[in-house]
Design a protein with these regions (language model features):
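A short, hydrophobic C-terminal helix/tail in secreted or cell-surface proteins
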Residues: 3, 209-216
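Nucleotide/pyrophosphate-binding catalytic subdomain
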Residues: 1, 5-203
Length: 216
């Protein structure tokens, strides 16, 4: 990605069919929304929680725009899941919790095709008014687990910048070692005691049957 004045140019020899103009239009639309919201904040001198949620959620939408175009040029059939429409939540704008059963109903009504690859921005859901809400710390991992639960997925894979779960914090303990397997109960205990690789509310989504299988 290269910025030239106010224009954004996207080039990659590995993706010659990539539609620069369409992608640029999507990115510009997202950034324009942020700019309008920021102008409102400057005028009012404050930032309500619902506005903060909309601004902080834009990063996921920008990532989805890139991913959608990169997968499209590879010839994949794609569809977008809008979390504000399908993930039913309760709580505030910045730390909402997903109602799994209510969300399952909406996913069932939408109907997912087996021949289609679905993309969904993480970290967000919808209020009872359809407004954007955030799922809090580790919200992207949480929304991945929520999505897996709502569609009865056989597996939920979370790719991150760390190798996995260690027996203790490798930043503090030099000889910390990677755990090859970990039960969901153990993962939940680690998260409650401060391990940042997993969040308690993500672990809570797994059933007791799944907990016996563990992570590995």
């Amino acid at each position: 990605v290269r910025l030239v004045g106010s224009e954004m140019c996207i080039r990659d020899s590995a993706y010659p069919a990539l539609d620069d103009k369409a992608l640029q239009a999507r990115l510009t639309s997202e950034l324009d929304q942020v700019e309008r919201l920021m102008q409102g904040i400057r005028l009012l001198g404050l930032c309500p929680d619902n506005v903060q949620a909309r601004i902080l959620s834009r990063g996921e939408n920008l990532s989805i725009a890139f991913m959608h175009e990169l997968l499209r040029v590879r010839g994949l059939e794609l569809d977008l899941i809008v979390p504000e429409q399908l993930l039913v939540t309760d709580g505030g704008y910045l730390e909402a919790h997903v109602d799994i059963e209510a969300s399952r109903v909406r996913f069932a009504a939408k109907g997912l095709r087996s021949d289609c690859l679905y993309l969904m921005p993480g970290f967000t859901g919808g209020s009872d008014k359809g407004e954007t809400v955030l799922l809090g710390r580790n919200g992207s991992d949480y929304s991945a687990a929520v999505l897996a639960a709502c569609v009865d997925a056989e597996c939920c894979e979370i790719w991150t910048d760390v190798e996995g779960c260690y027996n203790c914090d490798p930043r503090l303990v030099p000889d910390a070692y990677l755990l090859k397997t970990l039960s969901y109960k153990e993962a939940m205990e680690l998260s409650y005691f401060g391990a940042k690789v997993l969040h308690p509310k993500t672990c809570l989504l797994y059933t007791s049957d799944a907990a016996d299988e563990g992570l590995g």
